């Protein structure tokens, strides 16, 4: 977003569907792998809130479990329509229909998750640029 010069128009945030890690830093492995790619991964976890529907134009989820959990919090069809899957922005031939949770895996799993997130974000950003 910043590289595209759109950080004054696009706000990006991250949160979890559950309260398991609220207030904690991200997994140390994700921080390490993210840092190797030049990302600052130093935010503290927060749980998704229905108020996020008022704050954000789009809610992007990583997998079907996230989709169901967030959809259950939508108060209107308009809110539900703004919940999108990251997999909708992945290359059709990438072989994944969601972003696998790397938490129980190893280094390769964290790299894969970041690869898929980067790929999806590139396509999502292209779409947003056409809309702005």
Sequence positions of predicted segments:
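Phosphate-binding/catalytic loops
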Residues: 58, 64-132
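A short linear-motif detector with a strong N-terminal bias
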Residues: 38-40, 62-65
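Conserved active-site segments centered on acidic
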Residues: 1-56, 126-132
